[in-house]
């Protein structure tokens, strides 16, 4: 461990903004933790089906406010991509090579999970596992991948949207919701918000990369204004309080992204930007920075395999136990289930560690050694001074 810490510290450029990497790691871990807490696999009537404690326990809604951290991921993504594209242009790197490299790093680990689960689904069907069970498990793994497609599209559009003010996509989200929800317009209009909704934090990140929002006043305005707007939309405009989809719910704030989700995302981004200073101070410690660097190096591996880790623990326990286990196979309809689920989280994490050990090479490609880690090598030299001022 000491050797790893030393290698990561030695390989990190002096001007790298470590706090940005920490925000990305926190965003990924927030999504993972949220999925593990609000996703249940119920074993009954000879099948396994998905369920959510949010449908039975509305008092758990604040969990979605803490763990729905995708806006922070898009904030960081926009900041890093805009800075990377600016650096590429200065060095004369053509757009095709730049975007090809970034998309390859994004999708390289996706191929592994798709192949493994295609084979697993085929084997389960041949072995006699019911189609509803196979469909429920596959959906659990594949449905979170939607955000990668959106992120890839925004990455490809970075040269066009890098200077777009985040208010413009926010206005689009506002008008789409006004028409589809307020005026009874076609539901299909919501597809516009799939792009526009996530453009808001992405463009905000690009604004930060250009040197915007340096002062704390603007960041506090995002946090407080976004919070007040989201609360008002929930209280008086009929938006759901949960920031994730709830089975059986009247509507979802994420599918497609709603105005309430966009407002809440702005609040999250404001909080994230306010945390940059404290995070930079903490990350001066080499051991803490090494953990953040390792998580970033395998961020997509962690995201892609976290649901599989939960599934394998659930399935293994179902085969070994004499009866359904609380917090794992039972209906998530009381506080006892939540307490039991908390004790299963370390087991899920251990299983995920195993998948990380096996599949991290898909994300890291042919790189070797601490000095070759993506988390260290992506630093753009021209951002060093800007990072210190932010």
Predicted regions and their residues:
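Alpha-helical transmembrane segments and their immediate juxtamembrane cytosolic regions
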Residues: 2-390
